[in-house]
């Protein structure tokens, strides 16, 4: 009897649709079995199945399966979107590479969990023990430029009045042209004009007087907090000054987010970094302010003989003595900078800057037209340098007269035109006609020198979205920088209307 009851139950649980009912009635025997079941109560008490029972089972199972399938499809969709995001950042396609935002929270999350392919890195051939590195005696003497001095005040205007005080001064086109004519003794614009801003506290001025070896960095407009370097030897800790240049906004931000200690001389510290406050920011644009300590390191710290600049979002991984030995002393260089990972031509770099909205598109075009008019060709293997475009996040220098002159001329271009310093580097090299010798090392070594941390927030300004010069008229005039980039608004002594920029053919990934 039990087997008779179990048989229709098993059939019911393993079949669908009308088969349930037909099999059930075909196998059910109208005998006392129903009474026996009836006495037991439960779902069998009626002697037959409820008419809607099979459909309930079907709907329940179907709903569960639907939820599972929908969940799987949703997970696959999310995975596909994330994979596409990572792939777009690695793509050499113009369209897809523009979509990528390496500073987004999604990208940083994927990078943190190891889903983003590691940057191209290679071992750096450094001396194993910093304690054994021999530091050269004396200074490197230049053969061409032996003495350099700086313009500190602008010439009076034609009516005898003084022009407004600007950090970079009011360099004329004639003065700019003259600055590229090399002689043994030169006087050039190099920032820090009288009453132009970027003032240091007296306590910091006194401190840096004792700094011969410098690791410098900078944070402006509160975009980062200091990252402590790793693998620093005891010798380097004693030898180097680690100087973090900040503006007032960043100092307040740092104090609110990390521990800042004050020594007995009122010096402010975050770990190994001595904070150097620059009061009275010289520019409206925070990115342009950051070029002051980056390019004019020799002006901020005039007693320094050697300096290593690293961007504020970077964590240094290699001992600074090993860096100086590898990139300067071993090859008898006085200036070293990394090759850009993707671009060799400044026109390709300018194209990438426009696509990624790093500055106003028409102003980048104007900047490049001036350079092309003045003879700056696209990079080719015929050039003596391996690239016209550097990775400017790390700069290694001995502060010789020629190295200092190059830094001044480079800064003057950044001051006159767009704040994108990578666009001006190769131009200054070109104008010096081979007199400035430098070491441009492989990008894979550059990526092995540091860990790159994301900014605390993304940078954005209205000027970056400008597509036409007409947008600067009327209410848009407020987007014009009032203290930098004035060369973009000063009539140029040449016909730029006839200039057609070289066509950019993208053969590499976007940087």
Features from the language model and the residues they span:
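Glycosyltransferase catalytic domains, chiefly GT-A lineage
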Residues: 2-511
């Amino acid at each position: 009897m039990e087997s008779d009851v179990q048989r229709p139950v098993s059939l019911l649980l393993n079949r669908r649709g009308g088969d349930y009912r037909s099999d059930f009635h075909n196998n059910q025997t109208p005998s006392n079995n129903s009474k026996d079941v009836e006495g037991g109560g439960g779902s069998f008490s009626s002697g037959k199945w409820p008419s809607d029972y099979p459909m309930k089972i079907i709907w329940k199972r179907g709903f569960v399966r639907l939820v599972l399938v929908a969940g799987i499809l949703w997970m696959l969709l999310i995975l596909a979107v994330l994979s596409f995001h990572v792939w777009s950042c690695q793509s050499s396609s113009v369209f897809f590479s523009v979509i990528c935002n390496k500073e987004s929270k999604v990208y940083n999350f994927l990078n943190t969990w190891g889903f983003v392919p590691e940057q191209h890195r290679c071992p750096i051939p450094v001396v194993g023990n910093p304690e054994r590195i021999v530091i050269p005696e004396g200074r490197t003497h230049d053969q061409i430029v032996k003495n350099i001095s700086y313009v500190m005040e602008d010439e009076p205007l034609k009516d005898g009045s003084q022009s407004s005080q600007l950090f970079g001064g009011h360099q004329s086109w004639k003065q700019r042209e003259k600055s590229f004519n090399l002689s043994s003794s030169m006087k050039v614009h190099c920032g820090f004009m009288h009453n132009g801003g970027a003032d240091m506290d007296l306590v910091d001025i006194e401190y840096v007087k004792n700094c011969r070896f410098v690791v410098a960095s900078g944070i402006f407009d509160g975009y980062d907090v200091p990252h402590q370097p790793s693998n620093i030897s005891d010798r380097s800790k004693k030898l180097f000054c680690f100087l973090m240049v900040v503006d007032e906004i960043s100092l307040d931000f740092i104090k609110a987010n990390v521990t800042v200690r004050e020594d007995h001389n009122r010096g402010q510290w975050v770990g190994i970094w001595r904070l150097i406050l620059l009061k009275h920011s010289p520019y409206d644009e925070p990115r342009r302010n950051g070029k002051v300590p980056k390019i004019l390191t020799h002006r901020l710290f005039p007693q320094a003989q050697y300096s290593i600049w690293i961007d504020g979002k970077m964590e240094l991984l290699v001992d600074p003595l090993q860096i100086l030995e590898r990139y300067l002393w071993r090859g008898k260089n006085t200036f070293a900078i990394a090759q850009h990972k993707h671009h060799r031509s400044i026109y390709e770099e300018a194209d990438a800057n426009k696509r990624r909205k790093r500055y106003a598109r028409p102003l980048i075009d104007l900047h490049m037209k001036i350079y092309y008019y003045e003879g700056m060709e696209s990079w080719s293997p015929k050039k003596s340098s391996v690239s016209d475009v550097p990775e400017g996040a790390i700069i290694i220098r001995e502060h010789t007269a020629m190295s200092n002159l190059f830094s001044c001329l480079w800064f003057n271009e950044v001051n006159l035109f767009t704040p994108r310093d990578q666009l001006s580097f190769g131009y200054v090299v070109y104008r010096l006609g081979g007199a400035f010798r430098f070491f441009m090392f492989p990008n894979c070594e550059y990526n092995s020198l540091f860990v790159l941390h994301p900014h605390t927030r993304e940078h954005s300004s209205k000027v970056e979205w400008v597509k036409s010069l007409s947008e600067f008229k009327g209410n848009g005039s407020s987007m014009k920088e009032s203290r930098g980039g004035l060369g973009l608004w000063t009539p140029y002594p040449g016909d730029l209307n006839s200039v057609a920029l070289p066509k950019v053919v993208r053969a590499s990934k976007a940087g």
